[in-house]
Every structure is written in structure tokens, then in C-alpha cells.
Amino acid sequence: YTDDTICSVAIADAILNKRTYKDSLLDWCRRYPNPMGGYSTALSTWIEQDNPQPSNNCGNDVAMRVSPVGWLFDDYHEILEEAKKSAEVSHNHPNGIMGAQCVATIIYWLRTCRITKEELESAVKRNFGYSIPTIKDIYKIGSEGHFDGLCEETVPYAISCFLESDN
């Protein structure tokens, strides 16, 4: 299991058991301190603190762990708020929060609406301002050796991969 698995379970636990996102994340991450690949540097630092505070971080950790919000809430505005709350306990940069909100919202839309991939792409652009790259642009990551873990880059890449998928 990876850090994202542990953190996703922690978010689900917080929602289902009415815990704070912070308490649940700390509990689960401290209980499982050595996931495959480790925690990001920023999240590791946050976990290790006695009284962790959010950092001005826009890493994709928050987008990777937010899926339970999209599955367990049924109101669009509540999903935006809960995604924000789940992110800002450790990452309070607006770009990180927006990445979490976007991923949770996409899950909600796909779960509750009859929406085509074209409509989804348009809605993401309209609601979150993301420009979705082409698959050719994504292939360049490997050939050019460029990659970063920021929400503003990785969330649109993930959306593009979904839009290009057949299932």
C-alpha cells in the first residue's frame, strides 16, 4: 500500500466516523509510518510534528487522498467545502485546495450525472480553470524528464488520461 492509500482511508474514516480530518490523518499515518514509496517530504514533516499546522503547499497529496469526499457526499457545495477541509489541514495553498476540490467534484459528477467526457472537460475548465493537456503533452514528461508533484500540473494530467481512456 502507498501513502495515498493510507491517506484516502484516513479521509473516509474521518467522514464515516465523524472525526476531524487532521486527527484521522495523523492517526492513520502514524499507525502506518512506512508506506511503499514513503510519504512526501511535506507530509512527513507534518506527520512528525507535535501540533502540525498546514503549510503553504500545493502538492498533489491532497488530490490523491480526496476520493472519499466525492463518494460520500451528495451535495455539490458540501463536496467543495469538505474537499477544502480535507486539504487545508496539511496543505493550505489555494492551488492544492483547488486540486482536491476538482478531483472530488469529478467523482461526484461521474457518480450522479449523465455527463459526457466532453462535457466533463468543459465543466472542469469552467469551474476550476484547468487547461487539460493532450496525451502528446503528457508523453513528453518521460522523454523530457520533467515532472513535478504540484496539483496544478498533475490534476490536469490525470484528467487527460481519464478522458483518453476507453473504460
Language-model segment annotations:
Residues Y1-N167:
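Structured, active/binding-site neighborhoods that engage oxygen-rich ligands
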